[in-house]
Amino acid sequence: GRVAEVAFARGLPTPAEMAGALGAVPGHLGMLVETGAIVARLLARGVRISTRTIVTRACGSDALTSVELTRVDAHWRPAGSPRVCAADTLVLGYGFSPSTELARQAGCELDWDSPRGGWVVRHDERMATTAEGIFVAGEPTGVAGADQSRAEGTLAGLAVAQELRPASALGDALARATRQVEAASRFSTVVQRVFEPDRAGLARLAEPETTVCRCELVTRGRLTDALQANPFLSTANAAKLECRSGMGPCQGRYCEGTVAAIVAAERDQPIRESGRFAAQ
């Protein structure tokens, strides 16, 4: 099939954002060149690339037939009339969510960090979590890419080895691993900041008939009705118990963030105050 359009919800990077990203370029030039080549190839084949544009509706009865796209402002609020693009396939992506279920069940404390994906496992400079004897690396610390995951894995492994054998001469190796994590983090932090989704903006786009939880077929309207009927319902987990959102096979992997954002909007509170689903 033919790609009709690639739409980005955010605008082009500002001069200040570009200047702030310069420190992340060393060591990652190849990745930037590859990205530029992909964009050039799309443009050469006539693919439209739009910025400040978001999908506001997918249309069709038994199958997708068209997509409605709308210009948005800096906070992802529709700022123009929608246009329709014929399509039989739609791919959406608004960031990644770290898998932290095992860490939660093990008693590790989490922190809310929206650019890194939402709820991430708290750890120290050696990748040790708040739960004794448990170290963490990769995705649970925040979605940061393969390079940082490998570097964190090396650092965590060395830290575990040193803890098991304190007399081991691992000082130099630990220092190198720490520098590798720091270098990878400089790049990932820029990418995370530039492409952080506007979670409140996404929640606003959901209409009453929009399916929020696909596993249990819970709509935005059903969730809103429950929140309005119960003024003391103020967390994502409470909404889960009330509406069954997040009780399906995926256990909230797809809907937890949306439910938390909707609860936050209805209760006029930060998304972090909505909490998270209990890990099962």
Predicted regions and their residues:
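Residues forming the flavin
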Residues: 1-243, 249, 253-262, 266-278
